[in-house]
């Protein structure tokens, strides 16, 4: 940070922020306050936000209240939002002060009659989303009237995530009249999140008639939040029309149909509506039981009819076991449907009977290995992949022997089953469960994947007992820095001591050759042509912003790692996600890579590394359908889709990557 070269100082500041060590804050503060280069000062502010340390907040507050270049001020506001969100409960007063400062900065920008700073507004809106300052609604709502559609988009996004009603009158107008579809979609999100009853007619109109699928889906979802059953008939008619065509060839309609099913399940809970049930039966066949939205909606509307689909008890047990043995994805979806019955309100007729029947079927699924069924297939079925969802569903019934059932799963070979069992045991504190978690931890710490070990540490932490804390301390000696970090975090939260010095350094898996190869791409054009069952799209990778993440992706693609993987997660108007060898969202390449957080924003078409926590990336990646500013500074952006984004928009859950071809050239990639 003391180099004579400004680019080196800037990169050093970024590195300090990525590491996140509080000890770097004094040096970052010096750069923020005194460096002669604006880019260095801006990066210092960004890095201080990534450190999430309160130690630098006075300097950041001084910056936003002084005359500094716009980018420096914007990054300081962004940093205050990140720090406010990360402060522990005992520093709640300070967090409120930081949130108030963010809001005051936004108020100042909204009052400028000429030349407001766009970056300050956008980063300030996201900072407000994170800091959650009191009385933020009226200030944020001011930005709904700006000419810049991206500002309107982000203002609505912040109001939606904070569930603030202050802009609802204007949002009702934007819902029907704004020319930008993402503004309309986000307007629908706010009106749904705040349960704006007067918006019913406008939302129903957009759900049925908007020319953009993202708006229709957001409006359908919002109608579910309004809980107004008047929407059911119109939505069902729309769903019937859409389902008459081959949904496998009509992606936008598929996502729309699934959202309609989900919303009807919310609007018609326990209504036993025959027409809706008939439609859902057809959808179950269309999706071959592999749409959880359909299974859950069916179970909500008529638990009796849903259970009847499987026959009497003996044949039903055999049927669900057979489905699980043939197709784990279908088994997972059935489990989610049965789990919904476990959450039925007291008012549902024959609730106890239905819950007993559903629980019996879940236990049969859990016991699938003893079914006596012999299924011959040419490919590995991996029925065990459905068991985590079976366990979560079973937990909803709160059976007396749930602890015993979960403890028995701690000896399973599948690490995700053990992780799920450990996680659920965290809500069942008892001496027997503590002993079981203690016995399971040594094995989990030797796993290739650390999911089970992390879950065990979390569950032990919830018990907040001296005995549990002593067990957690054993992870301080782990070779995995993520386990050491988790142990330190849990022990500190439990008041059992500050062992931060035990985190130590990371044992990197990268060699000198790896670093040289990754750095050699900086300045080159590196593209990934992703061929899917819906067509190809091209990603411009960003080696200058995230060299190691790009190198990891390139190495995996070059060896054909992604070929045949399914897009296991598709959330309309949010993301599509792939890269999981298991296909259930829990898999990876058997190692983890460090985050390379950067200033590239999550605009539409951004390509990011999926995580389950800091530095947990591996092979799962996602593409954003629309701007997602809440992801900025939390997930590594390592590319952008530069061609074929219309293909990404057509992708639905279950679509497949055929191949990824990497194209490198010495031509410098164009700046975005």
Question: Where do the model's predicted regions map?
Answer:
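Solenoidal tandem-repeat scaffolds enriched in leucines and small polar residues
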Residues: 72-74, 82-139, 148-153, 160, ...
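Alpha-solenoid helical repeat scaffolds
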Residues: 11, 27, 43, 59, ...
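Cyclophilin-like peptidyl-prolyl cis-trans isomerases
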Residues: 408, 412-416, 427, 431-672
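Structural signature of alpha-helical solenoid repeat scaffolds
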Residues: 17, 49, 81, 122, ...
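Stable alpha-helical elements in mature extracytoplasmic
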Residues: 8, 24, 40, 56, ...
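Amphipathic alpha-helical scaffolding segments comprising HEAT/armadillo-like alpha-solenoid repeats
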Residues: 1-2, 21-33, 53-65, 86-112, ...
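Alpha-helix N-cap/helix-start positions at coil->helix boundaries
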Residues: 6-7, 22, 37-39, 54, ...
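Alpha-helical, heptad-rich or low-complexity scaffold/stalk segments
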Residues: 2-31, 35-50, 62, 423-424, ...
